[in-house]
């Protein structure tokens, strides 16, 4: 009986340990979700009552402000729950990300797969840093100011990196470079689009309020 109790206690401890590790620098907040699966959830944002969700935030751009959801309103083709979905063509997108069975890949948009081929999720966005090299910054984007967010790979781990305050895009890129991320892919931001939440030790932490229902897709990390 004591042995069974010890095993149950260990299992409970393992379940409760799933959380989000947070690292901070002078300019950035860095979130490392502890997860076993990633998906691109489309149509409706994961609810805070879903106990298996660790972290979720907006991923790809949304085209039009529509009252109903359709995959064609998501920028470029994307993979949801192992299925390739057709989106609208977006010239601003220069890169992409895919994940499946514990493996992931950041890439140029030209290399984004044409079929799911075993990848569980994927989406296209603005590629900021690839293999440690900063990608070209458009003149219109350079001085654009907001709180920025990116999906990154740092020291072999996936993380969500966010600026602590409103800054220029040019400065955000510099801070990511100084933080020495290997890859960085932009995540949709702006008022309402920045709404996100994560679970830390069983408690839900909301990042920025929800202001509208026009968001269409969320990168979601699961236990």
Language model segments and positions:
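Gly/Ser/Thr/Pro-rich low-complexity, intrinsically disordered segments
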Residues: 18-223
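Sec-dependent N-terminal signal peptides
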Residues: 4-15
């Amino acid at each position: 009986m004591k042995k069974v109790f010890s095993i149950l206690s260990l299992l409970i401890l393992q379940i409760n340990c799933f959380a989000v590790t947070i690292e901070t620098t002078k300019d950035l907040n860095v979130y490392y979700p502890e997860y076993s699966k990633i998906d691109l959830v489309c149509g409706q944002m994961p609810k805070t009552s879903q106990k298996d969700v660790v972290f979720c935030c907006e991923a790809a751009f949304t085209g039009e402000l529509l009252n109903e959801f359709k995959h064609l309103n998501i920028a470029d083709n994307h993979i949801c729950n192992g299925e390739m979905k057709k989106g609208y063509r977006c010239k601003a997108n220069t890169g992409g990300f895919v994940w499946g069975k514990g493996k992931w890949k950041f890439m140029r948009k030209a290399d984004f797969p044409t079929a799911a081929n075993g990848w569980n999720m994927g989406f296209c966005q603005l590629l900021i840093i690839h293999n440690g090299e900063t990608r070209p910054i458009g003149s219109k984007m350079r001085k654009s100011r907001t709180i920025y967010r990116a999906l990154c790979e740092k020291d072999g781990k996936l993380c969500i990196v966010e600026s602590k305050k409103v800054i220029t895009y040019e400065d955000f890129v510099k801070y990511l470079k100084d933080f020495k991320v290997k890859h960085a892919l932009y995540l949709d931001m702006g008022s309402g689009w920045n709404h996100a939440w994560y679970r830390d030790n069983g408690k839900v932490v909301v990042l920025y309020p929800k202001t509208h229902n026009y968001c269409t897709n969320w990168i979601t990390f699961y236990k």
